């Protein structure tokens, strides 16, 4: 199974929590990490199979937009193992 990483960045905490909740409920993904970037920007990262991550990011983006400010969302299908290690700090971030 090929894994993907999905990211949603919001301005403000409430939108980020709403996004993470919608992501977890919409598809079979795991919420891997949240990152407080600064200036009120927060990113939530999920992982799972490509189709599930795409569905989760779509649902999370819509949910975040309803209660806060969606800044960006993106899905990386089949990320390189080194990239996942560098950005997520997790050697098991991507399963091949």
Which role fits each region the language model picked out?
Residues 1-96:
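Terminal helix-to-tail segments of small alpha-helical proteins
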């Amino acid at each position: 199974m090929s894994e993907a990483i999905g990211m949603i960045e919001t301005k403000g905490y409430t939108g980020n929590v709403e996004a993470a909740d919608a992501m977890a409920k919409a598809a079979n993904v795991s919420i891997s990490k949240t990152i407080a970037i600064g200036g009120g920007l927060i990113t939530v990262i999920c992982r799972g199979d490509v189709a599930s991550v795409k569905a989760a990011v779509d649902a999370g983006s819509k949910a975040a937009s309803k209660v806060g400010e969606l800044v960006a969302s993106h899905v990386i299908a089949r990320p390189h193992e080194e990239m996942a290690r560098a950005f997520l700090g997790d050697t098991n971030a991507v399963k091949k």
